[in-house]
Amino acid sequence: KDLQEKLNVPIQGWFAQKNQFDMEPVFNRTKNIRGFQISSPSLIGLRSVNVSCEIYRSAKMDNIINKAHTGTKLMIDLYDQWLRELGFKLMTPRDSLKRGCHISLMHEHAKKISRALRKFDRVIVDYRTPNQIRIAISPLYNTYNEVYKGFKKIKKCVEGEKYLDIGDESSKVT
């Protein structure tokens, strides 16, 4: 609450106006959290938020967290079984309480591998400079089978050296 008075609002909406319905020519922000509002929330936006909350409520947060831990554990197990011997190095903590829903792998050809996976196998991973690939599970909708298949495609991409056919040109999206 202390910051509410100090922060400037970059977009000045009429809902944040001190005397909202006076329609004054000069913006005079209200002094509380209402000063950050821009306008009326859209019905579609509100409905989307409501549906999202319902999904999380029905899935139960403990189940989501458990699936995130189990999913990243599966990824680390597949790394140990398949990818370590292919030159990958695990950068993510093995302790599930010290990681989120993704793991990070280092490889000298990470950029080309990530681009080859997208181009040839329709597997989307995040590339981070200078040489890391981040792989995530979204616990609400990814299955363990999808994780397995994705890692199998990574293994085949590297074993078959598909990534060598990829140029070094930059891509804004990883």
Question: Which residue stretches match the model-derived regions?
Answer:
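Conserved PLP-binding catalytic core of the aspartate aminotransferase-like
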Residues: I65-I76, D80-D121, Y148
